[in-house]
Design a protein with these regions (language model features):
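Short beta-strand scaffold positions
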Residues: 234-235, 347-348, 420
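Phosphate- and divalent-cation-binding pockets in alpha/beta enzyme and binding domains
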Residues: 58, 105, 239-246, 316, ...
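Long, charged amphipathic helices and adjacent flexible linkers at domain junctions
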Residues: 2-17, 130-144, 256
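Ferredoxin-type iron-sulfur electron-transfer modules and their immediate structural context
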Residues: 1-95
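Ribonuclease/tRNase effector modules and their secretory precursors
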Residues: 381, 385-387, 392-504
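Iron-sulfur-cluster electron-transfer modules
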Residues: 48, 54, 66-251, 382-401
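Redox cofactor-anchoring modules in respiratory/redox and cofactor-processing assemblies
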Residues: 40, 263-410
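A short, charged/proline- and glycine-enriched loop
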Residues: 38, 158-166, 270-276
């Protein structure tokens, strides 16, 4: 009678159920020897629906897909085993920011960050990763580690250096004016020699499961580090710290915020009478920089109110895991969820956190705004640069630093044609992840090789150009002032031309 019926009736489970958010009611008192029907119903309603959802409550990703880790892992397993057919779980997998909050919340050490990471690596190795999901982010990383941005130098007139400042790729892209100010601050306060290195740590490769590309990026950084004399890195980005820890263990590093906490702060240019909620980037989880930031804020007399989910329990802004590129709707869910938790202006110390929060209209300060900005009001709603502007800003930072600090002459690319982009085309470029340099290449090719269609009804030209794995279509007009691009489009299909004999 009792065979295979161990878990029926009353028994002790492994479930650890927290009742902090539950409403409790008084025990129902029996009016007689046994409960009446009404009393029994009332007493039964006091029972909690005991399901462990601690990881789901703070995660808009698990909420959007209405799934718990156990089912998530089962779906991933099924997705991995499909040889032919539709991989239905791809979108879900690529919508995880890999922030690790679910692992922190879980009493059973189930961390979807690790599961999703391994799954992405497997998808890449089996050639099942959708190319479009992370393509632009990887190309942007390639740009940042090209000669247009990647640079390293020792401090002028110093043979040996103890430190090298590495701002990452997003801070120069969004706040280019701060990089030289930070470097000057560091050289003014530290006498042991401070070098500079510009580039990308490889976070896009890590987040997209591109293991080989990540190894190449780590090797690029390590080779430059050896040439500089193996200095300690001063990192301004928490994602850089995470990547250095995972892939470059032999390199010593410290966060910029720990350095600033130790030394005297810059003289402030703007008044500080702010009430702020601090948002910790998810890659700062379990690091010393969280305390350093709070120490710095206390020194400049800002009033800080902690968010419900902060420090070890902080949430992702919506950029992690490259979700911003793979699933923009899910990314917006993360952004809006974090904004709704905040009653004050936000204070962040991650560039992408600031860019994403301000993109949804939330007043947000970067820690560097409080230390170096001349206009805090303007900084609070600073518009997120376009993808093309981000690359331009990186080149601008590199060229200015080489000229102003190292006295090197920098060669600028000549503009062959006066090309302007109207508002419609600019919006389409952002939507489709098209950068200005590719639009210019398309226009230049059409003019020089006469590869274009002419539309006499509106005097416009239409051209296409295949660059790497994307075909770009550009519509433009020619007038006395130059060339105006009016529309753009891109796709991954390759347009193959055939001669008349092939057609027959």
């Amino acid at each position: 009678i009792t065979a295979s019926r161990e878990n029926e009736g009353s028994y002790e489970t492994v479930l650890k159920y927290k009742i902090d958010d539950e409403e409790t009611t008084e025990k129902t008192i029996k009016s007689g020897e046994i409960f009446t029907k009404e009393e029994a119903v009332r007493e039964a309603k006091r029972c909690f629906k005991c399901r462990c959802r601690d990881c789901i409550k703070p995660c808009v990703h698990l909420q959007r897909f209405n799934i718990a880790p156990k089912s998530y892992i089962r779906n991933i397993n099924h997705n991995e085993r499909i040889i032919q057919g539709t991989h239905y779980a791809n979108k879900m997998i690529l919508s995880c920011t890999e922030c690790g909050l679910c692992g922190v919340m879980c009493d059973y050490d189930v961390d979807m960050k690790d599961v999703v990471k391994e799954t992405k690596i497997s998808m890449v190795e089996r050639k099942k990763m959708p190319q479009s999901a992370h393509d632009f982010a990887l190309k942007d990383m390639k740009f940042s580690n090209s000669e247009k941005f990647f640079t390293y130098r020792k401090e002028p007139e110093k043979e040996n250096i103890k430190y090298v400042f590495y701002p990452g790729c997003q801070l120069p892209a969004s706040s280019p004016d701060y990089i030289e100010k930070i470097y000057k601050y560091l050289t003014d306060n530290i006498n042991e020699g401070i070098g500079l290195m510009l580039g990308c740590c490889g976070a896009p490769a890590d987040w997209s499961g591109q293991n080989e590309l990540m190894k190449e990026t780590a090797a690029l950084i390590k080779n430059a580090w050896v040439e500089l004399g193996k200095p300690t890195f001063i990192l301004a980005c928490s994602s850089c710290m995470s990547n250095f820890k995972k892939y470059m263990e032999e390199i010593n590093f410290i966060s910029l915020w720990e350095v600033m906490d130790e030394y005297e702060l810059p003289k402030l240019n703007a008044s500080q009478s702010l009430k702020l909620n601090i948002h910790d980037p998810c890659t700062s989880r379990n690091t010393n920089m969280q305390d350093s930031i709070r120490n710095i804020v206390a020194k400049i007399n800002c009033e800080v109110h902690e968010l419900k989910y902060s420090k070890e329990f902080t949430k992702c802004c919506g950029y992690g895991g490259l979700v911003y590129f793979a699933n923009r709707e899910q990314s917006n869910d993360f952004i809006d969820d974090r904004i709704m938790e905040s009653n004050e202006d936000l204070l962040v110390y991650c560039t992408m956190c600031k860019d994403l929060f301000t993109s949804r209209g939330k007043r947000t300060f970067h820690m560097l705004d409080l230390l170096f900005s001349d206009d805090l009001e303007k900084s609070a709603l600073q518009k997120m640069p376009t993808l093309s502007e981000r690359q331009h800003n990186r080149m601008h930072v590199r060229n200015n630093l080489l000229k102003n600090i190292w006295g090197e002459e920098v060669m600028y690319e000549d503009e062959k044609y006066n090309i302007k982009i109207n508002d419609n085309a600019t919006a389409k470029m952002e939507e489709m992840y098209i950068v200005l340099s590719d639009v210019k290449k398309s226009v230049e090719n059409s003019i020089e090789n006469k590869e274009r269609f002419f539309n006499p009804s509106d005097n416009s030209y239409l051209t296409r150009l295949r660059i790497e794995n994307v075909t770009y279509w550009v519509q433009y007009e020619v007038n006395e002032e130059g060339i105006t691009v009016t529309n753009v489009y891109s796709h991954r299909m390759e347009v193959v031309e055939a001669n008349n004999e092939d057609i027959r």
